[in-house]
Swiss-Prot record:
Its EC number is 2.3.1.178. Residues 1-148 form the N-acetyltransferase domain. Belongs to the acetyltransferase family. EctA subfamily. One of its GO terms (biological process) is ectoine biosynthetic process. The keyword Signal does not apply. Keywords: Acyltransferase, Transferase. The lineage of its organism: Bacteria, Pseudomonadati, Campylobacterota, Epsilonproteobacteria, Campylobacterales. It comes from Wolinella succinogenes (strain ATCC 29543 / DSM 1740 / CCUG 13145 / JCM 31913 / LMG 7466 / NCTC 11488 / FDC 602W). It comes from the Bacteria. SUPFAM superfamilies: Acyl-CoA N-acyltransferases (Nat) (SSF55729). It is an enzyme of class 2 (transferase). This is L-2,4-diaminobutyric acid acetyltransferase.
Length: 173
């Protein structure tokens, strides 16, 4: 079952992300703020009362037509079932219901995070959109003490023709 995250989910989300290498783990406090402030653009996947997946996103303040997918974490035993894809689609539909006109999805990935790169490439192929990839952040900018990989930015711009819909209606996703 998909549902919005809440403040009470912070510790469980933190634990899940800690088990999903190579994701950077943030503080439980950060995940509490996600549940408080970004529940419209984020989602958790729950089975039998346990959080088995989370997609955390936000609308960019200076480009609110763009959904930035910040973290995708799916429990190891639940991977390969399309949960991440369905979660992103559920977020898009939720944002549309709330009156947002999303024109692109953005995300970053490190070269070692092949699953993340594969997810966004698969979405681009399925939605028949041409994605754009560019080197975004040098690793040295992200850590003063230990090595951090560079971050690549992938953008999936939508077009009504590519999605087969009028405007930003994501009903066919």
């Amino acid at each position: 079952m998909f549902r919005p995250p809440s403040i009470k989910d912070a510790k469980k989300i933190w634990e899940l992300i800690g088990r999903c290498k190579p994701l950077d783990i943030n503080s439980p406090y950060c995940y509490a703020l996600i549940g408080r402030d970004f529940f419209d653009s984020s989602i958790v996947y729950e089975e039998e009362g346990r959080i088995k997946g989370v997609v955390i996103g936000y609308l960019r303040p200076r480009a609110p037509e763009r959904l930035f997918v910040w973290q995708v974490a799916i429990e190891a035993k639940s991977r390969g079932k399309g949960i991440a894809k369905r979660a992103i689609e559920a977020i898009l539909k939720n944002l549309e219901r709330k009156g947002h006109c999303i024109q692109a999805i953005e995300a970053t990935y490190t070269p070692s995070n092949l699953a993340s790169k594969a997810l966004f490439h698969a979405l681009g192929r399925e939605w028949k959109v041409v994605w754009i990839e560019e080197n975004f952040l040098e690793g040295a900018l992200l850590s003063a003490q230990e090595a951090h990989e560079e971050e690549w930015l992938i953008t999936l711009p939508f077009s009504s023709e590519a999605l087969g819909v009028q405007g930003a209606n994501h009903a066919n996703l």
